[in-house]
Amino acid sequence: MAKTSTSVIAAKTLVHAAALAPIALLGWQFWQVWQGGSDALGADPVAEIEHRTGLWALRFLLITLAITPLRQLTGQAVVIRFRRMLGLYAFFYASVHLAAYLTLDLRGFWTQIFEEILKRPYITVGFAAWLLLMPLAITSTQGWMRRLKRNWGRLHTLIYPIGLLAVLHFWWLVKSDIREPALYAGILAVLLGWRVWKKLSARRTTARRSTPPPATPR
């Protein structure tokens, strides 16, 4: 037990380090650009910051969705311990993505966000995804699981429409080359398709078990 706990702690430390590495690199590059004389973030630093943070939010969302299939395929229940952490990193990067848009793109004129939401569909679905992520992040603790009981599981099924909205946000944002959003859409389709297949398989198994065997003639 102690060995397992130590291994899990070590693994979580590595996951934290890996999850924070992109934002640490981005912060360092932003500092270089801010000081002047660096093109570390390309010709349009604001667009690059928004792109990277949004991309990592989507990646962590998909990795979170991959935890359940991974557990079912490998039989390693320990991977479930990383799901909450990865989901919170998805919310973290999504929040940084939104903050970058509000502060760097809109330059603090936050009241414009409502106009942008109504005018640009990709912002509409992106903002909706972030709003739906918020209650999942807030209720991710053991305390909330005990309070909500069965409703906790129902609430956290919101991650499925959130995934769809996030991919749609990326797809609509890209003007020409849709290969990258198509890749993430394909990954999401596989992850959701796996869940549908497992549920249908479980129903068929239950139906077979509940069907009485045919009566033998006497």
UniProtKB/Swiss-Prot annotation:
Superkingdom of origin organism: Bacteria
Cofactor field: FMN; heme b
Cofactor note: Binds 1 FMN per subunit. Binds 1 heme b (iron(II)-protoporphyrin IX) group per subunit.
Membrane-traversing stretches: 14-34, 60-80, 86-106, 121-141, 155-175
Biological process (GO), any one: protein repair
Compartment annotation: Cell inner membrane
Alphabetical keyword list: Cell inner membrane, Cell membrane, Electron transport, Flavoprotein, FMN, Heme, Iron, Membrane, Metal-binding, Transmembrane, Transmembrane helix, Transport
Any one Pfam family match given in the protein's UniProt record, by short name: Ferric_reduct
InterPro entries listed in its UniProt record: Fe3_Rdtase_TM_dom (IPR013130), MsrQ-like (IPR022837)
GO molecular function: electron transfer activity; FMN binding; heme binding; metal ion binding; oxidoreductase activity, acting on diphenols and related substances as donors
Subcellular location, principal: membrane
Alphabetized HAMAP family for the sequence: MsrQ (MF_01207)
Family classification: Belongs to the MsrQ family.
General function of this protein: Part of the MsrPQ system that repairs oxidized periplasmic proteins containing methionine sulfoxide residues (Met-O), using respiratory chain electrons. Thus protects these proteins from oxidative-stress damage caused by reactive species of oxygen and chlorine generated by the host defense mechanisms. MsrPQ is essential for the maintenance of envelope integrity under bleach stress, rescuing a wide series of structurally unrelated periplasmic proteins from methionine oxidation.
NCBIfam families in alphabetical order: PRK05419.2-2
Protein name: Protein-methionine-sulfoxide reductase heme-binding subunit MsrQ
